[in-house]
From Swiss-Prot:
S-adenosyl-L-methionine binds at residues 167-168, 199, 221-223, 298. Specifically methylates position 2 of adenine 2503 in 23S rRNA and position 2 of adenine 37 in tRNAs. m2A2503 modification seems to play a crucial role in the proofreading step occurring at the peptidyl transferase center and thus would serve to optimize ribosomal fidelity. It comes from the Bacteria. HAMAP family: RNA_methyltr_RlmN (MF_01849). It comes from Nitrosococcus oceani (strain ATCC 19707 / BCRC 17464 / JCM 30415 / NCIMB 11848 / C-107). This is Dual-specificity RNA methyltransferase RlmN. InterPro entries: Aldolase_TIM (IPR013785), Methyltransferase_A (IPR040072), RlmN_N (IPR048641), RNA_MTrfase_RlmN (IPR027492), rRNA_lsu_MTrfase_RlmN/Cfr (IPR004383), rSAM (IPR007197). The lineage of its organism: Bacteria, Pseudomonadati, Pseudomonadota, Gammaproteobacteria, Chromatiales. One of its GO terms (biological process) is rRNA base methylation. Signal peptide: none annotated. Belongs to the radical SAM superfamily. RlmN family. Reaction proceeds by a ping-pong mechanism involving intermediate methylation of a conserved cysteine residue.
Length: 372
């Protein structure tokens, strides 16, 4: 039987304000309940002791706080954690926590599978089912915070969030933005925009919308310096080629000298890792406040690609540094538990939907004037 009660985990502060107004309550109740849910990790309304008994009873009748279910938890030798979480419909997604010094980063998924089918990514190859609900996105942060607890000083262990897990976040725009509103809200998780990063393959119109409503840090899954090569690696490039993508990046950081776009570049042996590729990348990014993360390819079953060797990656990085682009090589973390970049796969029950849904997505996206 379907539960008709409202899942409060789907609502940010504005949504909760509206919910309590409908109950005849003052909007300040939203702030109280946000603290209980997201700061004290309480899901039982009867335990919310600063609410009067009558309101607690009405909440029990009309609302619920429903979370994903932890199926498995793995811990890597390097301290990386990976959770397999069951969502509604018996599909599963993966969430990863990466500790490093005084920084702890949670990598969050936004879809069950991924609709974009990038050729080098395990998520894209395992199918697509649906977008995650707000409760399923913010629920990953809720569960990880509750599981990991706080450090000896009482500080939260999770200091940063990256929307870089399974799925294309901007293809689930409204739910992702609502979840990020909760991440940034001082009555919920209180993260600075500098500590929340969204990674996109390049959904240009949605990038402009994001800048207008929730301008967190932007990362772009670039992976190639030319349209010809990027068409092969990232099929969305056929819709939004590099000139459009880079123009959107410039608009995103315009007027704010504190901002730069991070470009992710997976290093594929013999495909995109030569010095001519590095020089083409320098030309492409010229004049744009940019950082480049070089990502050693993480193999998965059935992949045709190989990881560039360390010497090749070093030469590529040095070429970019000489050209004035801040460049780092991302340290591979959690590969012994398949938690490294590009390895997340989860479990999708219906793998037949990706082609249909991808075609529908492409058909409704505004077309770039430069796309052929």
């Amino acid at each position: 039987m379907t539960d008709s009660r409202t899942n409060l985990l789907n609502l940010d502060r504005a949504g909760l304000d509206a919910f309590f107004t409908c109950l005849g309550e003052k909007p300040f109740r939203a702030r109280q309940v946000l603290r209980w849910i997201h700061q004290r990790f309480v899901t039982d309304f009867s335990a919310m002791t600063d609410l009067n008994k009558s309101l607690r009873e009405r909440l029990t009748e009309s609302a619920v706080i429903s979370l994903p279910e932890i199926i498995k938890q793995h811990r890597s030798a390097d301290g990386t954690h990976k959770w397999l979480l069951r969502m509604h419909g018996n599909n599963c997604i993966e969430t990863v926590f990466i500790p490093e010094g005084d920084r702890g980063t949670l990598c969050i998924s936004s879809q069950i599978g991924c609709i974009l089918d990038c050729s080098f990514c395990a998520t894209g190859k395992q199918g697509f089912n649906r977008n995650l609900a707000v409760s399923e996105i913010i629920g990953q942060l809720w569960l990880a915070n509750k599981t990991l607890g706080r450090d000896p000083k009482g500080e939260r262990i999770i200091t940063n969030v990256v929307m870089m897990g399974m799925g294309e976040p901007l293809a689930n725009f409204n739910n992702v933005v609502t979840a990020m509103n909760l991440m940034l809200d001082d009555f919920s998780y209180g993260l600075s925009w500098r500590r929340v990063t969204l990674s996109t393959a390049g959904m240009v119109p949605a990038m402009d919308r994001l800048r207008a409503v929730c301008p967190v840090n932007l990362a772009v899954s670039l992976h190639a310096p030319t349209d010809k090569l990027r068409d092969e690696l990232v099929p969305l490039n056929k819709k939004y080629p590099l000139q459009d993508l880079l123009s959107a990046c410039r608009r995103y950081v315009a007027g704010d000298r504190r901002r730069a776009v991070t470009f992710e570049y997976v290093m594929l042996a013999g495909v995109n890792d030569s010095l001519p590729h590095a020089r083409a990348l320098l030309r492409l990014l010229r004049g744009l406040p940019a950082k480049v993360n070089l990502i050693p390819f993480n193999p998965f079953s059935g992949s045709v690609y190989r990881r560039s060797d360390a010497a090749t990656i070093d030469r590529f990085r040095e070429e970019l540094l000489r050209g004035g682009i801040m460049t780092v090589t991302r340290k591979t973390r959690g590969d012994d538990i398949a938690a490294a970049c590009g390895q997340l796969a989860g479990r999708v029950q219906d793998r037949t939907r990706r082609t249909m849904d991808r075609q529908r997505l492409v058909s409704v996206l505004p077309r770039s004037p430069l796309a052929s």
